[in-house]
Amino acid sequence: MKPTNILTYLDETATSYPDKPSFIGEASALTFLELKSNTEAIGSFIADKNIYNEPILVFMEKSPEEVSALLGVVRSGNFYVVLDLDMPEARLDAIIDITKAKLMIVDGHTKEKAKSLGFSGDICSYEEALSTQANDELLLDISHKAKETDTIYLVFTSGSTGVPKGVVASHRNVIDYIEGLGKVLECDENTVFGNQAPLYLDASLKDVYTTLKYGATTYFIPKKLFMSPVMLIEYLNEHKINTICFVSSALTIFTKLSAFDIAKPEYLKVVAFGGEVLPLSHLKQWMKACPGARFINLYGATECTGMSSYYVVYYVEKLENGIPIGKPLPDTEIFLIDEEGNIIANPHPSAEISSKDEESDHTVKQSAEMENLRHKGEICIGGTGLSSGYYKDEEITKAKFVNYQLTDGRSILLYKTGDIGYFGEDGELYFTGRGDNQIKHRGYRIELEEIEACGGAFEGVDRGCCIYNPEKEIITFFYEGRMEEGMVKENFRNRLASYMVPGKVVKLDKLPLMAGGKIDRKALSKLI
């Protein structure tokens, strides 16, 4: 039976594996029992301040201690919001303004920075919170009041207006996500994670909460090692790390610097990747270097608690159309809806779907004629992992989360991802690009990711990104690699329709990246 509170994982694991390491950083490590004790002390400290069901800011360096603080916030009946030194000051101030939090927990690395921010609440040190005597009676009372729909965290994503949006996630969202993901990754108490994602990103959930459920161990890989892939491989081998869930661009660092010519991961059993498309040329090199590992492509959105679908890669040679994003995780449903609101492909072929809201009243029907393979539509996700929306932003929540009524009697809430996809002849779901990266050029609709996928397959192109200038009507392909610009353009001419060939090709020493490792498209836009 599934728990209703995420802390049940920690409490049970601390009983089963009290002395086993849970999280290990550069300077410290915590056993499961130590982690549980820390959360009880920190939870009591916060609860003593009579703060309940409110956001608490945690501004610390990534470490086992930061995990203690996050879970301590949850133990107190509140929800956490992670701040990080990598965030620009304007973003930090925006999050502070949106949350109106009363308390911020800091450590020695962030204390001075915290004082310079526009925060009017209490700033307390991690050490002060940790020194509190656990109040068992108070914590028990809080746990009795807790509901599975209570918020556990806010993760802030970029907003189209430049103001970040806080995605709300509950205990039930995270529990159902971890229950399904753990089965896909085949986790158990012997799983050893190597964490890459910052804790302010939902991508870190795969490591943190799966560790709590299974009694696994997570190593926080030093950030500097991602600039030295051979040293990173040595780190993976030294600590016998057998499972990694990396953003795709992190995997390409190994291959573009030819790290596998010098060393190979010896213990990897699972290599999961997502966040952006992984070029097939890089996947082939990884599969050759780690022939005994399972490779899993994960797809999802922050608004759906991270990942919603998966595809296990067995034969990369057969992936002519790229890597599928596959099938839904348990307790998840995925629909494709076209521009007219019709379902293109549906796991419930006999269903009729109605969308009713204040703005519209239309009925969407599933029929055999609509099940047109490779007919593209917007990927819409439903299920228990679906967020309740954006924090204090009802307008955009209503726009992105749409309530549907199926004619079989079921009602379902769907998140409109803005991603475009299609169902292939193999029955798998394929991602082709963002709806907002779909352009109309010379009378044709073009998905920029389709051009990027083509360029990423060139031998000598490590990775690339397309930017479109609508005023000049020019597509620019920026890339890293050893292939010269003229040859890249010639390859495009040989492989793409003429209207899709980039008007400009620009070679860069290094593509600009965002904190999570994705390519920074806004930074590239400034170069055109």
Segments from the language model and where they lie:
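AMP-dependent adenylate-forming
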Residues: 5-7, 104-117, 121-144, 174, ...
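Gly/Ser/Thr-rich phosphate-binding loop
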Residues: 213-216, 241-245, 255-324, 330-333, ...
